[in-house]
Design a protein with these regions (language model features):
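Feature captures hydrophobic
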Residues: 1-115
Length: 115
């Protein structure tokens, strides 16, 4: 899988999340290592989510993981806290804000179950 294919798939998964109740401004950068290597960011602002294939220099947190790990996290098949504990996910920056990633994934999972 190429980075472009991986990014399109992950973007689709995260865009499914209804973040309208999250009013905080949060920015996460994701560094993909190994196959499909690349960088993208997720920004939450005013209840909207934006995902772009660029570096975000003023990020709250930075996550580094393999494509498989990030895909499983985005699908709700792997808990990001467990992934961090098992050293499958590296986190740098504001840990309190980084933990909000789980909130976004949980919101997406609830919406998927309602469909």
């Amino acid at each position: 899988m190429t980075y472009s294919e991986f990014f399109a798939e992950i973007k689709g998964k995260f865009l499914e999340a209804d973040v309208s109740n999250i009013k905080d401004h949060l920015t996460f950068q994701f560094n993909i290592i190994g196959e499909a290597q690349g960088i993208f960011y997720i920004e939450l602002k005013n209840g909207k989510i934006r995902i772009e294939p660029y570096v975000y220099n003023d990020r709250d947190a930075m996550f580094t993981a393999s494509p498989d790990t990030l895909k499983r996290i985005a699908e709700g098949k792997m808990d990001p806290i467990w992934a961090f504990t098992m050293q499958k996910l590296k986190v740098e920056g504001n840990i309190d804000k980084a933990l909000r990633l789980k909130e976004i994934i949980d919101l997406k999972q609830k919406q998927t179950k309602k469909k």
